[in-house]
């Protein structure tokens, strides 16, 4: 068995039977089909920043390391073609260095570029879908490659077609980004609201976002974590109003179809769970939405902690929290909600 500790940002001591690296679509296809021919479970892994190994993986893990950034310029926009294995934050830095703007709000989000569309990553007023032009997908059974337009990706809050139709037997091999030259700053969240829209620079937004994230979120290289563990819940206007009546300071954001988005971190914090610990896993003291590997945590420790948090939030607010992190069992991905219910 081979250790996966350095390939998951939680830093959990999980193991796999085999570990392979794919540096091209062709090698990814060959490695996947080889494992399947041997009747082994297969797990495709990027940066390992959004996964929780609940136990050892009884099969082959393939690391997607398809690299490369190509850029094309038109009169109005920049078009970037990015290999799925490229580190997301390094991509943001690359674009900024080359005076290609629009990704600054998404700085310091961990993981690889190929994972960005799966979750439709987002932060500080921007989501991946806002900068996406297309996503290239490889059918691992047939070898066929398909390019999906942004509309075909069916992006929603922390959701996409890659969690559904293109989840099994498919892999993202590259993404296409469209960044307009007529750059407009997005300053709706956090300390960004203090910046002047008239003279703010992309570098200032980048610096501010990095400062906010490092002040709240632990560095996975030092303290194991997977970033935001839970999704911000979407609730009806009736539920939101009831919470607002009892807790006037509760953060609420208008969402689509008359729904409201609540702040999961605030809900957890109001349950007095900062610092709460089960085994080696605990709730981060500065950001309640982050669960950390405090001391040799196991996947079971994290699952039990997440389940306890979910029960407390239901009891106090009547709101169900769903994990944003993918749960990996012995044969592959398992239902995270079911696991903590």
UniProtKB/Swiss-Prot annotation:
Primary location class: cytoplasm
Instruction: State the InterPro entries in the record.
Output: FAD-bd_PCMH, FAD-bd_PCMH-like_sf, FAD-bd_PCMH_sub1, FAD-bd_PCMH_sub2, MurB, MurB_C, MurB_C_sf, Oxid_FAD_bind_N
**Which UniProt key words apply to this protein?**
Cell cycle, Cell division, Cell shape, Cell wall biogenesis/degradation, Cytoplasm, FAD, Flavoprotein, NADP, Oxidoreductase, Peptidoglycan synthesis
Which residues are catalytic? Answer: 158, 228 (proton donor), 324
Which pathway is recorded for this entry? Cell wall biogenesis; peptidoglycan biosynthesis
Location(s) in or outside the cell: Cytoplasm
What does the record give as the reaction this protein catalyses? Answer: UDP-N-acetyl-alpha-D-muramate + NADP(+) = UDP-N-acetyl-3-O-(1-carboxyvinyl)-alpha-D-glucosamine + NADPH + H(+)
Q: Does the keyword NADP apply?
A: yes
Enzyme nomenclature, EC number: 1.3.1.98
Can you cite a GO biological process for this protein?
cell division
What sequence ranges are listed for the domain FAD-binding PCMH-type?
12-182
Gene Ontology cellular component terms for the protein in this record: cytosol
Q: Which NCBIfam families match?
A: murB, PRK00046.1
Q: What does this protein do?
A: Cell wall formation.
Family (UniProt): Belongs to the MurB family.
Question: What name does UniProt use for this protein?
Answer: UDP-N-acetylenolpyruvoylglucosamine reductase
Lineage of source species = Bacteria, Pseudomonadati, Pseudomonadota, Gammaproteobacteria, Enterobacterales
